[in-house]
Amino acid sequence: MSARKYFGTDGIRGRVGQGVISADFVLRLGNALGRVLTQGRSKRPLVLIGKDTRISGYMFEAALEAGLVAAGADVQLIGPMPTPAIAFLTSTLRADAGVVISASHNPHYDNGIKFFSAEGEKLDDATEAAIEAALDEPFHTVESERLGKAIRTRDAIGRYIEFCKASVARGFTLHGLKMVLDCAHGATYHIAPMLFRELGAEVVVIGAAPDGLNINAGVGSTHIDNLAAKVRECGAHLGIAFDGDGDRVLMADDQGNPVDGDDLLYVLARSWQASGRLTGTVVGTLMTNYGLEQALAALHIPFQRAKVGDRYVHQALVEGGGTLGGETSGHLLCLDRASTGDGIVSALQVLEALGRDRQSLRDALTSLSKVPQKTVNVRLDGGAAKAIVEAANVQQALQQAQAAVRGRGRAFLRPSGTEPVVRVTVEADDAGLMQDTLDRLSGAVRDAA
């Protein structure tokens, strides 16, 4: 397949008002999607549009709506909702596509567009290529009698809450549990507190007062220290932090210790194995901590690594018949419960596992020993990152680094595809060995640059 012109690994994203993240481009994008969906159809396609809480969402929602309606597609406006909720609603409302206006964990001045298929899954490469091709064609408005219509959906919140509840056993309850929720001033701000309270938890909420500008600003899964401090302050059993669009989740235990995606993957894998729910191979990424790989091996749980990005984790799970995977950042996939990464559903799976195993979050992690890991970004003065990584002296240094940590960790290089940077990562069970190996390997990359 030829290189993508607009789409990245997770839709289209960037700074508002710069490049393609502009109202006129999003208008054309909506029109392109509408034209792709109407091809070969006599019936008007239906497209759902959701968004997070950043202020530019209003502008892009209107632009998408206009472009789609002009192409002859009907639109349902969902309003602020978690990204995975749009995936679910696209499927359950029998829509032909779902669109989310969000830049996930990025600051308010960024925004982006993500797409879902009729099945509530990320678009395949062929459909993305068709949309890109349509973008290079003139804007088209159908005859007046074929124009689409737009309505605002009123029952989306209730539908999604019931979907989340259905992901755990019918008798599941959180009575007696005190938790802190950090909603990142984002798309989960109204849903998550309601859901966890309905399940019986005592909920202390932070990061749930969005103003369009404060999404992810010092709150949420990218600023876990705030959650940890609040857990300690109010004596909660644990804390849960989402990112701005609700597809990531991180936690803090009762002592305020941060719990990342690798930790949560371990809790779920071990519990699911014991209950017979675990199938296939657990999938992580190149960045998944070596300690998790070793801990799963000790439990005889097969594990494999995919490229960084939940798109690639999902692909590996589907190809290998697995249902559990995730990233250190908190993108967790529980494919027997949701078609995409869902922060709320993932949090419920962890809480259900802890309840079934009669363990606190801290106790559930006592058998997992992660190793020190560090990444250094080496910025290049010239030359492509891929060419630097493939240079003979860099490859020799990489082989030496891998030999130094063999059986105790890993060493690898990742050339950036978007900037002149080589990411150098080393992890080892000894911090001194890790740092020494990292210094040597990153030095070799700098010398080659």
Curated annotation (Swiss-Prot):
Keywords: Isomerase, Magnesium, Metal-binding, Phosphoprotein
Domain of life per record: Bacteria
Note on cofactor: Binds 1 Mg(2+) ion per subunit.
One Gene Ontology term of the molecular function aspect: phosphoglucosamine mutase activity
Residues engaged in binding Mg(2+): S104, D243, D245, D247
Catalyzed reaction equations: alpha-D-glucosamine 1-phosphate = D-glucosamine 6-phosphate
Active-site residues, record numbering mapped to chain: S104
Residue stretches spanning the membrane: none
Record has Zinc as a keyword: no
Residue list for modification Phosphoserine: S104
InterPro entries: A-D-PHexomutase_a/b/a-I, A-D-PHexomutase_a/b/a-I/II/III, A-D-PHexomutase_a/b/a-II, A-D-PHexomutase_a/b/a-III, A-D-PHexomutase_C, A-D-PHexomutase_C_sf, A-D-PHexomutase_CS, Alpha-D-phosphohexomutase_SF
Post-translational modification: Activated by phosphorylation.
Name of a matching Pfam family: PGM_PMM_II
Similarity comment: Belongs to the phosphohexose mutase family.
Function: Catalyzes the conversion of glucosamine-6-phosphate to glucosamine-1-phosphate.
Name of the protein: Phosphoglucosamine mutase
Species whose genome carries this gene: Xanthomonas axonopodis pv. citri (strain 306)
